Amino acid sequence: VDIIKDAGNCWYPNPSYRNYFFQSEAHNVVLFNGKGQSREQQYHGSMLRGYLHYLLDADNVKYVLANGTGPYSDQFSRNFRHFLWIDDVIYMIDDLKTHDVGHFEWLWHPGGEAEKRGIDLNITNGNSSVVVRPLYPRLLAKSDFVHDYPEDLYWEEVEAPTEDLKGTETYYSFHLPAKVDRVKGLTAIILKETPDQKDLPYMERREGKDWIGLRIHYKGKITDLYINQLADGRLMHSNSWIEADGWFTDAYMFAVTYEAGMEPAGSKEHFICYGSALRRGDVSFFSSLAKLFVIQKEENGRMKLWMDGQPKMNAGFRSEKRPKAVVVNGKVTPVVYEKGTVKVSGVVIE
């Protein structure tokens, strides 16, 4: 079931093809000042392509980066959408920079019955159900009295043709009232086990000096997610080092997951997005001479690593004990363990 869907298609001669189905409005994208990709591109294409990068699949943790800057380059100098899937939640992070100041809006096409409840959009189709929860730059206005929430996202219901052209269906647009030229959008898509599930992840919005993030409580685990505000290209000639809750890093984004009641330093599951180091006090948890994308897990005495980002990768990872085995991108590698650090070298993407 496509619980969040694209609008579909229709036969070419129908005006709805070129006026709607071929356009950005028919997809789950961000519009700027009401516009998406240039409509001229349906006739001439785009010389600048979009790309998918750095796919990591570590079972309950997955990541991929979608770079749509090229096709949007008439309006955007930066149009990145990160997908980070941890357990039952997909975090969608939009990193957007435009040439001019204006209004951003997020489009959502439900593949089922949609209902706004407070700050959430609930979508249900049979036994499938998700919650779409915008968290940054603002929450969704809690009630229909949007004038009581002048800074929060307000929603618009838009009617559009169905794929069979026999009627219309509704999609949603979430508008940011502020006029800006740079924004971080973070939306949580919560995958419900059943439509009636009540015990959903509890999410705290958190921020500090030069970072924003979340703390997620769910099923006895805590996940801390951090987004580095200095690592988005705004400082071309300066480092992007931040300190967040005792973690010191230059990573664009990172997450640590640990059991409730434990200290974050005891985490056995880390995600690092475009970073060269992660330290806490005098202890190095990850280090490399080049910025990498990494998922690290310690399970049953084994260290598992998923790595991408460079043609050849060398890095060190903290481990309190010498692991029984080290598996990198699905392959068993020799265990090189020195002074609490597992060293891997010569990793290439095949």
Q: What residue ranges belong to the model's regions?
A:
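CBM-like, beta-strand-rich accessory domains located in the C-terminal region of large
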Residues: 12-350
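Structural recognition of the beta-strand scaffold that forms the well-ordered cores
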Residues: 2-6, 29-31
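Zn2+-dependent peptidoglycan hydrolase active-site motif and core
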Residues: 9
